[in-house]
Amino acid sequence: MAELDLLRSLPATVAGPSDEARARARERLARHIERAPSTRRRRLLILAVVLAAAVAVAAFASIGGRGTGRASAAPLLQRMASVARVQKAQQPLTAGHFEYSKWIVGYLSGGDGWYALNPGVRESWIAPNGSGFLHERWNKPTFPTAADKAGWIAAGRPQVYPPEDSGKLPPSPRRHLPTDPDELYTTIHDAAAGHGNSTDAEMFTLVADALRDPASPALRAALYDVAARIPGVELVGPAADRLGRHGVAVASVDGKIHERHVLIFDPRTSALLGEEYTQLDGNPYHYPAGTVTGYATYAVSAIVDRIGIRP
C-alpha cells in the first residue's frame, strides 16, 4: 500500500517548471471531473492457437476502434504474464549510464469553453538510482470539435503548452512494487478503492501506470496477473499502434465517466506498445462516442551514456 501511496504522491515531489506532476495531470485531465482526489496523478489468447492466428492477421484495427468489447481479456492477460516470466532480465544499470525512453503522446487540455488535444514527444533519462530527467516537445494543438476550436480562438488563441519544457524526476516508487501477484493485487486494489472513479477502472489505470516505465520481467508478469483478475477487462483483439506495430489490445470501460481505456501489447515480448483514451456516449464533454482524448505510444527504449543523448 505504501508503494502505491508513493505512486500517487509522486507528482508533488517533482522539481522544476515542467515536472511529473504536470505530465501526469495532462495524462489524467480527460478524467479529472470525477477524480478530484487524484487529479494530478491518475491511472492476450483465449487459446494459444487464437493468439497465434491473431498475430498473423495482416489487417489490424486501430487501438481506438470501438470493437465488440464482449470477451474477457483474462486468458490473454494470463498468457502475457507467462510470456513476461520467461523474458531475460535486463542487466542493472551501471554508473554513467541512463535508461532512455521516448513516447509519442497526445493529452487533452483546455480552458473555459474549449479543449484541445496536444500532440507531442516526451523523453526521459533514468539513472541507476531511479532519478532522472524529463524533456517535452509540443506541437500545435488539434481540436476534438469545431466548437472547441472556436472557443480557443475566442479566448485569444492561448498557448496550451510551451514548445519545449523539461524538469527533474525523482526515483520512481514503481521500483519497489511487490512482484508476488497476490500481494501486488492487494496493493493496487487498496490504492484504487475510493478514488472517485470505479475501483476496477482505477486498478486498470494503476496497472498501466506501472507498465509504462521499463519493469523487470517478474514485475511485468505480476502486473498482467493482476490485470487478468480485474472484473470487466475486455479483449479487443488484434490492433496496431500509432507507429504501425502489430499487437493485441485489451480495454477497460469506466462507466462513471463514460471513457474507454485501451492498452496494446506486443504478444511476443509482453511489452506495452501504447494506450488510448476514447469517449463513450454520455461522457462529460458531450463529445461523440469514439472521440480520442489522450494517447501514448512507447516508441524507443535504450541505454545511453548521459542525459541528452539519444540513440
Where are these regions (language model features)?
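N-terminal export/targeting signals for secretion/compartment entry
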Residues: M1-L77
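Intrinsically disordered, low-complexity prosegments and terminal tails associated
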Residues: L47, A52-P311
